[in-house]
Amino acid sequence: MIRLTEVAKEYPRSGVALSHVSFQVRKGEFVFLTGPSGSGKTTILKLLYMDDRPTKGEVWINGVSSNTASGRDITLLRRRIGIVFQDFRLLEDRSAEANVRFALEVTGAPKANIRPKVARVLTQVGLASKALNFPRELSGGEQQRVAIARALVNDPFVLIADEPTGNLDERATRSVFQLLRDINAAGTAVIMATHDLDLVRRSNYRTIELNHGRIVFDSAESPASARPFDEPFDVEITPTSRETL
């Protein structure tokens, strides 16, 4: 379903972001991307939803190649990919329901299908009773649930999550992570970048660790005892406050 082959990414100012990165993600798999800030996690995620293209190598996702994809190919591909960010990226002047509905409207979804789809995903994330609330009326955990609902409404085959619990307290983190686990159990692949090593250690999901743009560990190929991340990573805290669920 997803394959990276000898992928490298270089930027004119910052230099090498990725080097010789190769791995595959199977249908329905849950994969953690870990590593210190600047190790290449977010760069990989951007390549997966083709916000950027590799300098060398190739990214294959759902039959689309980064080397040959047209703009239309990428547009259609993104409709099948759910993306969740650390800072939620909600429209502040729209309700939870309207934020989710917008993701369908921009794809030209039939109007008759929009309301039931939105209701379904808001129920799935546990926010049916707060559909008309605006982001400012929701906690951080609830805002992230709205963002997840928005990512799910187009029935993606993979959910890409970039530090989805990074701005949440422990209680909200557990709740959001359990939601991601439930989504994965229902058949959607999840690729999650995180600094939260406690979360990783408590899970049995595949873990790929990056450092200086290279893969230094992949639990699919190495025993768990070989994991190199014994010490906490340096974490960048964004200005968004940590809120409870």
Regions found by a protein language model. Give the residues of each.
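ABC ATPase NBD coupling module
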Residues: 66-82, 185, 227-228
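Short coil-to-helix segment of the ABC ATPase nucleotide-binding domain corresponding to the Q-loop/switch region
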Residues: 94-102
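Conserved ABC ATPase signature
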Residues: 134-138, 142-144
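A short, proline-enriched helix->beta-strand linker immediately N-terminal to the Walker B motif
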Residues: 153-157
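Catalytic Walker B motif of ABC-type/P-loop ATPase nucleotide-binding domains
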Residues: 159-162
